Amino acid sequence: SLEADYARYCDSVGKKYNEEYAFKVLDLFPNFFRPGIIDILKNIKKKKKKNRLIKVIIYTNNMGPHYWTVFIRKYLERKVGKVFDYIISGYKPGTNINKRTTHQKTVPDILRCTGLNKETKFLFIDDQQHNRMVHEKVTYMKIHPYNYGIQFKTLVDKYMASNLINILPKKERETFKFYILNYLSAGLIGYNYKVTKQEISKKDLKEEQRLSKFIEVFIKNKNTRRKKKRKTISRKSKKRY
């Protein structure tokens, strides 16, 4: 069957496939990530060095496996260094992946999953409306959704033209291309993939600037900083004899 043949060829790739290789595959398609996200994360990292109270959380409703979110975090940190403090992945009842109690995004769940105190103030950035994140401790930034797609043939051709294909013997490459294209085109990846946008728009670039500025203002705002508790030192009067 097509699925069996596809699995066989993927297995031959998988024997030499590792995390670093997967990172290099992602490097072929930088537009899969929102424009400017790497520079934004680098800037946040600089801010964190000056203020250890700044924490960065990945809070996602993606229902893929937890390791996929971890993989994306590792990929981004490969570019910018350690920047994320917590990952809160999709709610999966009956598992111990995290301490979420609902599919909805909520402040109580963030506190439960991270252990942060209830006085913590958040900048919440999302392209969807999450009503339970409208909260006195939350500055909510709803951003324009970023969509970018590649036709399967373009995606496969770019991969085949890179040196990453060298993990397969030359005599097997065209056969691999045939099976992977047919597998993708047959809709066997588990969901309906539609390419609606294949270029970065002016709106995407403007949103990058707006996002950078919003983060900068939030971090600078004294009212959004957590204050460190000062130790009170009692001074005893010295007795002179």
Please tell me what each predicted stretch does.
Residues 1-95:
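Alpha-helical substrate-recognition element adjacent to the catalytic core
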Residues 65-239:
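C-terminal cap/substrate-recognition subdomain and adjoining C-terminal extension
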